[in-house]
Amino acid sequence: MAVQWKTKEVSEQLGVNPTTVQRWVKFFGIQCETNEHGHLLFEKEHLTVLKAIQNQLKSGKKMRDVVIEENEQLIQKPETQPMVATEQYEQRTKQFMEKIAELEKQLSQKADDVVSYQILKHRAEIDEMFKTLQSLELRMAKVEEQLEKQQEEFPLAAGDVPKRKRSFMRLFSF
């Protein structure tokens, strides 16, 4: 069995942070074994690849420009997905746009239905208030009529002050 190192040990050998090693492994797709705790295990070949990456980065290259030539079998190439035909893409886009337009139309119709329902409900409330107002006006008119009748029949009870009768003679008394 070959010698295996954990991420921390490899990072110490390279003089970098352990998260840097993990980032390189992920970015470049380096295939490593993992132990039962999920820790990455590196072999001598992995270490040479990581040193090559480190040297290229130290020389000023960006990570996307780094080329790994040695031990390429350790690098997992990203799978390229097949291209979709332009016609198929446009057809699918058109279907999506039609579906979106249909959903917008349904949403608009639903909103119109809700507004119509609310208007009908408000109209019913206004009609009910109008009927209540009319009945109150009738009751007020009846109460006013009764009050006028009582004032005619019983002027003193209604609060009228009786008129004083002055005799003609009293006017000249000193």
Curated annotation (Swiss-Prot):
Highest taxon above the source species: Bacteria
GO molecular function list: double-stranded DNA binding
Recorded GO CC terms: cytoplasm
Coiled coil: 84-157
Key word Cell division present: yes
Pfam (any one): MerR_1
SUPFAM superfamilies named among the record's database cross-references: Putative DNA-binding domain
InterPro entries (alphabetical): Chrosome_anchoring_RacA, DNA-bd_dom_put_sf, MerR-type_HTH_dom
Annotation: DNA-binding region: 7-27
Subcellular location: Cytoplasm
Keywords: Cell cycle, Cell division, Chromosome partition, Coiled coil, Cytoplasm, DNA-binding, Sporulation
Gene Ontology terms: biological process: asymmetric cell division; chromosome condensation; chromosome segregation; regulation of DNA-templated transcription; sporulation resulting in formation of a cellular spore
Family: Belongs to the RacA family.
Chain's role: Required for the formation of axial filaments and for anchoring the origin regions at the cell poles in sporulating cells, thus ensuring proper chromosome segregation in the prespore. Binds in a dispersed manner throughout the chromosome but preferentially to sites clustered in the origin portion of the chromosome, causing condensation of the chromosome and its remodeling into an elongated, anchored structure.
Protein name: Chromosome-anchoring protein RacA
Organism: Halalkalibacterium halodurans (strain ATCC BAA-125 / DSM 18197 / FERM 7344 / JCM 9153 / C-125) (Bacillus halodurans)
Name of the gene: racA
